[in-house]
Amino acid sequence: MLIVYHAMFYVDESIGIFAGDVWHTLVWAARRMWIGVPIFFVISGYCIAGSVRSLQDQPGGLKQFAQRRFFRIYPPLWVACAMAALTWQVAETSPFLSQYCRQIKGVGDLSIWQWIGNLTATESWLHHIFSSGSGPNYLMGIIWTLCYEEQFYLIAALMLIAFRSKAFLGSVAVTAIAALLFLSGLAVSPSLAGFFLDGHWLLFAFGWAAHHAINESRLAGKICIIGALLLTTVAALLAMRGENSDTALHFDLSLASAASFALLLIIAHPWDAVLSKARLTQPFAAVGKISYSVYLTHYAPVTLISAAFAGVGLHSHFSTLAVVLPLSFLASWLVGYPFYLLIERRFSTGRKKSAKAASCLPESIAPQKAPC
């Protein structure tokens, strides 16, 4: 989904969903494929809830949790950052690409603390401390999502320490605080920007709630969770009425898409086995297997392709959808698949452990590890 969104960076502006021809409508939808991020946060919440549940009564459970998360995220991130820095460095030598690609980041464009923030996935909040709150500076536009992920993992680890078998209650307490801040308007305070309490925890919590509803809740608890997710979806959609700017719509659409996806997980659970064996879902298994690698490596090539075609005048709705988008998918696969084989797979915890980790998700979506 994010490949589609990033391929649209230089396409002609679309006014509204029904303001033009079919290409216009498709571009309007494609420019909102960033909803893959809130959906990814829901999947992450579901998986982490499963991990916490499986480890909460085991000796050394916290250590296992931390090791898995560290090796899953950081070594591939470091290699991807090195690749992106090299790609930007080469692209910067081209006057043509330097003129048209706004995403290029030279090595000197980031301070030492910003490099540390990118490599540790802390840049979303580290700038408050070391850059006087001037705002984050990302080497790649996808790193901000990992900054939130690491915060989610940290909070989940604290839940494991403080509550053990009652970790879900800890997540409920954090969710209540996050919801109160959001409803009161305090979540949008500049001082909270980049922290999990700026509203993004809610997206993660939807996944945790879905896992609890499916695996642990009694009927009354399941009904309460479904009701809360449904209410959130409806309220977010109603809040979007009359809004046209992406800024105004962004978080309401994030809430609506995340809550509705969590609802889908709960509702579709009885058919997991059937869906996982359906011929229609089989291609997603191959894509999902390498999705984190594609996620980490697609940003630079896709934005360069989009900028290059825009630079020669091919930025219409038709040319972007018919030429730029297919090339973006191809480039993402050509870079992401070798990255998976050579880098990510080396840091996996083995086939048996990977299969166990995948089982934290309903079978029908288990292959989808990251938005792509």
Language-model features and meaning:
Residues 38-40, 202:
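His/acidic/aromatic-lined binding-pocket segments of jelly-roll/cupin-type domains
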Residues 49, 73, 77-78, 119-184, ...:
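Hydrophobic alpha-helical segments with transmembrane-like composition
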Residues 4-33, 49-63, 126-133, 159-171, ...:
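Alpha-helical transmembrane segments in multi-pass integral membrane proteins
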